[in-house]
């Protein structure tokens, strides 16, 4: 199953570190291929106590795009990412956590065909900007570099206002979104 990563999940080292800390087997996160999600934009409307700032989300916005990477993951590997992003289901299979899975069409960079993929979108309806921390954005930008995403996209990532003087909390502390 294809998975489209666009935020801190672009950084496989950060995903592996989270998995190690919380006792999960890290997803293989290979092969990663640069990809584009059209008609969405990147935003930071979700506050995480762990990161001490905003964390990435996608918002439907015709004419905009989000760059990221495609990974071929098993359902078990996606379940690990579900735990990482705090995706939860109630007894009626309604998504009630911080993020929900959505199916999207993404373009593999350099190829014209679209691929169906799973990605995560925040459940919160609040859509104002919560500045991320420098540490969080560094992880996102390192992930973007590792997949050869465009310098224009990296400059865009660097343009977001950041939290000043706040440090991320140690793993295992904070709110329900602290695992993010």
Task: Enumerate the language-model features and the residues they cover.
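Glycine-aromatic micro-motifs
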Residues: 1-180
């Amino acid at each position: 199953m294809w998975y489209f990563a666009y935020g801190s999940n672009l950084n496989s080292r950060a995903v592996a570190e989270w998995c190690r800390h919380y006792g999960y087997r890290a997803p293989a996160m290979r092969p990663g291929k640069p990809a584009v999600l059209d008609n969405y934009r990147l935003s930071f409307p979700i506050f995480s106590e762990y990161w001490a700032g905003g964390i990435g989300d996608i918002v439907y916005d015709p004419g905009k795009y989000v760059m990221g990477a495609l990974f071929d993951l098993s359902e078990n590997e996606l379940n690990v990412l579900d735990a990482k992003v705090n995706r939860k289901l109630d007894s009626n299979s309604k998504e009630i956590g911080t993020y929900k899975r959505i199916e999207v069409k993404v373009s593999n960079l350099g190829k014209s065909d679209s691929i169906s993929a799973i990605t995560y979108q925040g459940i919160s309806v609040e859509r104002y900007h919560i500045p991320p921390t420098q540490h969080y954005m560094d992880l996102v930008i390192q992930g973007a570099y590792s997949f050869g995403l465009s310098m224009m996209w990296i400059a865009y990532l660097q343009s977001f206002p950041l939290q000043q003087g706040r440090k991320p909390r140690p793993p295992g502390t904070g709110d329900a979104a602290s695992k993010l």
